[in-house]
């Protein structure tokens, strides 16, 4: 992705703008940036793709690994994730050790279906995984080799998603506590002493905990069991009392512990440990030794992982190679080192002498901050799937062991031993049900991109939202450049779910690194180093906006920096002392936050809403890039993967709506498929539009087609509208919005939504269901839109209740007489034996049928067991903007449309231009999101163009700003490095004049507006300008709902609730009080009985209405009967008495009700719902 396309100020030839087209169709933005950035924004999907590449060990990963090895980087993994697991589990030996089975060289065959076919067929996009399995008989030395199929392994698409059962899903990266050694200090509740604890947390296996209590004794807790003296453990590991005193004699805490310790020999110590860990079992020295070995010293049972060993080495000053075979388990040196660190900490020591790379150095002794990003790491996709495969293989290992003992040695082959079911099931379970495998958010390209870059502290092995306190959720200084401090959800997950910062990347150990420019002796170079949160603590780092001269040296002698050791306030230091400098001002924020212009003028809470609401923007019929952008729009759109990009340089040879063919410079030909009106996960239209014509030349990365919500390869989530900040007859009170009818009639804010409707024909006990046009008791005009198969034709306009697919289901009935059977055979009267179960358009929906997919078992389509045919209908509807829809800007300024005014009634400017939208000015000061006002002014400047006379002071910082432009410019004002207030004021004064020679808006940003109804001017000047407005997914059409008669709850017989259940409105407790207060007794009685759960009454009312009779008296509601039943279950005999004192019988005669129901054609038999939606 070329940096020069992001900002015009970095282009050498600054053409006078009029949207100069570059070779690849992207438009040039005029940028207000002043800071040179040595590094482009990296590939924003690398978090997902690189992790998965490592797991499967594909070509891209091998190239990257080779580069890293050539560059001398030792931290990079040299074996793929799958190879690691198979190596780890090999060899599987039987209980006697006579046979072994080992695995190597995992390989993938080609996928069965392409990604598009998988979406069509509801299949999983996966490739068959094969492994070389070797069976060895240790007695005879005989070896049998086979290549074994290990199941279908889901593959990641180019966009970083997975297609599982036909739907796109994303695996979210998890933020977890890193394995390693941790030290804590807590105040004792009973005394004023501090209690010190140490823990070694492994990647998997038993915890090892030490504690110095208020009596100054050092206790150890193995595997979360009872506490015992640490000296007992040391003796069990072979140390004598004199060795312990020699090593720890200077510490009172260890001396006190030794005095209390009653064991003298190693055997005693082992037995003592065994009694504590396995109370009730007879202790033996061998069993105790095995138990202890298995807990911490056996690689099969205990694994620190590379990262755990790295953290322990760093924390305790141990010099043990990460590559050594026993690096993943503890040894006596680790245990001694952690005890020494803890007792030093308790004694008030500040440092220890330790070794690193063979040299002595001072090790700082301090407690840990577990929320620091040096102690929290990322488990990305690759590692999450790897853990799942490991689980599956360990289950398979048990099966293999059992089969080794039961099968005949001669007949055994690897194939007969292996059962791949547990492995396949583990992978399926992870992708289908894990909390971290999520249905992809496809509202717009940004929503998908952000979803893939999400970091979640929830999920298996993570936190739970109920138990997470404030500390974990809080913004931490180590988040800088790693996790965005702004973008996080509102609500119970706040702070637990974050987003990776724009420049952040994950190192091989799972820690997030962020780039810094190297500084030496006050000179800032373009050399970039990536630092983890731990590394960063050792340096003095300046921020990106520290002023530099033309030679990249600091202008000022004193520079504002973040101190060594982190935390604390920024301080001023001499320029020569600075060691690193931020790469870019937007380094600390995520992609969505970096798309908010003038973010620096917005309150953080509103910026959070702005970042989150951009993800809810619906792609509009015609996309329009923002006139006031931040320069991040192109990177976001391209990396989201919804824009079609040239993979190789070449010339376009053929263009059609859904296919572009390019002849590449290397002689090959590439076909680029263009998606047309597909349905996204959220029901929005996923449509791509070709931008190139035949004969056009494109370089690598050139844009071939725009996707949804992109414009010329830039992210375009909304529309630039003319906004006035004023009150209008109180219609924009409390964030309500007034719109112009123009936006409705010209489809400015219209969007296309596509719904999918599905029906299948199954085998039932009474016979097969049939998809047919021959439906009983349905008139021909209703069937007019169906073809001969009974399926609606493409292009048909449908409304709620229309039949999309005709289907009949056999129903059981009494035996027919031979005469009836004969008549039926002659006249083909089916009505008696089948019922109509056709697929109809649900309530409140309508649109045009744009797609039909028909699957039939006879055509060899893969269908679920018992399903013979499956039909999918796609219905598209154009939703115009309407009252009740939600609009928002990019600064958290959201509102609901209250009134749509005719164009002639809208306020208008002096040149007659009516405004598009009227917002309430009171929405700005209290919310402190002033960025929207600056955007408004700059939007006006961009739309009108400018002509600068002379060289005023404010222009000197903008050498690349064109001095004269036409109308309709597009600008970039990057986050924390954007247009300043004096620049905006100066440009407002210099904007182009109207045909009459008037300057409509001067440096105040305000103008005189006229009332469209009277033509009179409003008394005060009003802020007017262009603002970028998004239409959010909260559309009133999806929410509005009405019910006539519908389903009732089984027990209370009251109507169900909610639109999905076609439910009623709840008339709750408080509403009842209101009617009681007004004395509206009859209205209330109706609501509580015949309109709700008086079963017989409601049928009789229906009958009375149909026959035109008076409404009958209400009966007893069902809920009252339920109440009486509940009281009877408590042994209280409750009777209902009439006013005369006679007992009222609670049973009504059902015959009458069923008679009335039959007459009126009401179906009282409660059909079992086919799906959750019908409940």
Swiss-Prot record:
Q: Name one GO biological process term.
A: DNA-templated transcription
Q: Which GO terms describe its cellular component?
A: DNA-directed RNA polymerase complex
EC nos: 2.7.7.6
Q: Which GO terms describe its molecular function?
A: DNA binding; DNA-directed RNA polymerase activity; ribonucleoside binding
In its keyword annotation, does this UniProt entry include Nucleotidyltransferase?
yes
UniProt feature, compositional bias: Low complexity: 7-23
InterPro entries according to UniProt:
DNA-dir_RNA_pol_bsu_ext_1_sf, DNA-dir_RNA_pol_bsu_external_1, DNA-dir_RNA_pol_su2, DNA-dir_RNAP_su2_dom, DNA-dir_RNAP_su2_hyb_sf, RNA_pol_bsu_bac, RNA_pol_bsu_CS, RNA_pol_bsu_protrusion
Q: Which SUPFAM superfamilies does this one have?
A: beta and beta-prime subunits of DNA dependent RNA-polymerase
What is the protein name stated in its UniProt record?
Answer: DNA-directed RNA polymerase subunit beta
